[in-house]
Amino acid sequence: MDNLKINRQMIRNPLHNSGAVAVSFVILFTSMLNRRHLRIKILHVLYAFYQDEERDVVKTKKALDHSIEKMQELYLLLLLMIGSMQSFAIDRIEAGRKKQLPSPEDLHPNTKFVTNRPLRVLANSKNLSEAAADGNIGWGNHQEMLRKIFRGLLDHEEYTTYMASEERGFRHDRECLIRMFRKHMINEELFQDNLEELSIYWNDDLDLAASMAIKTIKTIGEADEDVELLPLWRDDDDDRQFFEGLFKETLAQATENESYVTEAAANWDLERIALMDRILMKMALAEARTFSSIPLKVTLNEYIELSKYYSTPKSHGFINGILDELFGKLKKDGVIKKTGRGLIE
């Protein structure tokens, strides 16, 4: 990936300022990856590809596959981070008891956090430790960062409220742990700064990976002694085929789809059309032409949404107009063909 340099701020959002990003959570899935995220992954590497003089397809595909692997690594690291908080809490309690002049609080500590049941499941998870070992994944030299995150947690409202509450119960433990993770751990500026240094992919992956970590915690039942990890892909191959096919066909159809865009945008100054917009439209056309079971409206809406986040403020209107015109024309000409219930007119 050394020669496929990605402008991280442009890819994340060319209009957003840098700095810690508050993570939001709106998506829950039965696997880690979803099609919108796959589209974004492909968009990232194609943006780098078209900026690179070599335009090496093989190298670009390797970078794409690597970014998917890094997504899974981040998911596991987040779960490991949550589990590590118990170890720091235990160390703190033991250190307090060993003081020469321990306070009553040191001698009789509040153990509500260290006995939080979902936290204990994560901290002692065989499935998680084996998956991490198999991928050689761990926080390694970043223990001090985790320790500082734990220290910050001690003063966070979610933690102090939880510890002061007399409420008990598995559901209470689980909900409070999720809030501590969501509101403090991953939104800690130190964590986000380190994340950017560890991998160029992870700031864009954090939202989804954190959603997957929360989904995993929510699956922990009261009687569970271990956690079931989410698979990277669903059991069926539909999403994997979509991923492979969209990347391949966007490049294979690039020249032809570029000509369609050029024709439809005849009244526009083509040199002023942003590279990001051109890539989005070529991806959308490749998707519409290749995947007969995906409704055109779905494809259109997906790329309009991506343009709102990754391109200029006016791009979504431009892309909407061009794609709407081209989809209608190419469907009429038989270039775009749809099959399945509700897709054949």
Model-derived segments and their meaning:
Residues F25-E345:
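Class I Rossmann-like S-adenosyl-L-methionine
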